[in-house]
């Protein structure tokens, strides 16, 4: 129960939203955290030919963006849409946010027919694992679900990018993320899926004093969450740019 309370506090959205997107600090990270080997050739072709691009982001509470206080503006899928349109002017880009709070990997898969397949996206970004770890879902069950979900996406010929768990010192002190992180990395390597290492990225930010919820007054935490989402979106745009580049 304490794990879920800590996770809930991390994602809390009980404060008023800021009037405009707050400026994010310099949140660059080492290339090895962002870059991965798999490529996204279909997305690359769409961007090069300026064909319409639809990206579905399916995930949990952090995808929904509740902690920012204004999910419609500040959630990272919304900020990703802005970042990609700036990088690829003239390309019609739509990013659809399909985040639902407190769902396991299997519960997200159950939404695939409605929230992914029916939308025929160019790219699927799948953020998962945080709630599985918080609920201590058996790692073998988590592994089987993730493998099954990726197989379904592959059957529908959908390019996919995985996003691993969130990191904060408070959650890491009560939740053992490591088996889930290792499982995601292994499955991504075996399946040739691009893994966006959000956990390692957020840990880098925390260790380098870029973001720290513990040191910020409660009334400023929605602003900080919005900054984190902006940085995630910017780094995701970096990852996509890397993944569409021919080696």
Where would I find each of the regions flagged by the language model?
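Catalytic His-Asp segment of secreted/periplasmic serine-dependent ester chemistry enzymes
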Residues: 169-247
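Internal alpha/beta domain cores that form substrate/cofactor-binding pockets in large enzymes
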Residues: 54-56, 85, 91-119, 124, ...
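Serine-esterase "nucleophile elbow" of acetyl-processing enzymes
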Residues: 24-98, 113-120
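Positively charged n-region of N-terminal signal peptides that target proteins for export
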Residues: 1-3
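Bacterial N-terminal signal peptides
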Residues: 7-14
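Solvent-exposed loop/turn segments at secondary-structure junctions
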Residues: 61-64, 100-106, 130-135, 166-170, ...
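N-terminal signal peptide c-region/cleavage motif recognized by signal peptidases
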Residues: 14-20
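Active-site segments of SGNH/GDSL-like serine hydrolases
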Residues: 127-130, 149-182
């Amino acid at each position: 129960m304490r794990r879920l309370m800590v996770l809930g506090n991390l994602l809390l959205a009980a404060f008023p939203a800021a009037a405009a997107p707050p400026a994010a600090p310099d949140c660059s990270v080492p290339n090895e955290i962002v870059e991965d080997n798999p490529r996204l050739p279909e997305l690359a072709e769409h961007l090069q030919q300026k064909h319409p691009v639809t990206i579905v982001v399916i995930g949990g509470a952090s995808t929904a963006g509740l902690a920012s206080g204004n999910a419609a503006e500040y959630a990272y899928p919304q900020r990703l849409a802005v970042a990609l349109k700036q990088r690829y002017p003239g390309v019609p880009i739509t990013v659809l946010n399909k985040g639902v709070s407190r769902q396991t990997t299997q519960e997200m898969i159950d939404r695939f027919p409605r929230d992914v397949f029916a939308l025929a996206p160019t790219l699927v970004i799948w953020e998962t694992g945080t709630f599985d770890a918080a609920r201590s879902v058996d790692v073998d069950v988590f592994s089987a679900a993730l493998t099954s979900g990726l197989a379904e996406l592959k059957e529908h010929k959908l390019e996919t990018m995985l996003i691993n768990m969130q990191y904060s010192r408070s959650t890491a002190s009560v939740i053992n993320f490591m088996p889930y992180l290792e499982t995601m990395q292994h499955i991504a390597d075996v399946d040739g899926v691009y893994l966006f290492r959000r956990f390692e990225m957020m840990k880098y930010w925390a260790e380098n004093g870029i973001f720290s919820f513990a040191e910020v007054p409660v009334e400023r935490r929605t602003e900080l969450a919005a900054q984190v989402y902006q940085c995630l979106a910017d780094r995701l745009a970096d990852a996509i740019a890397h993944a569409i580049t021919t080696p």
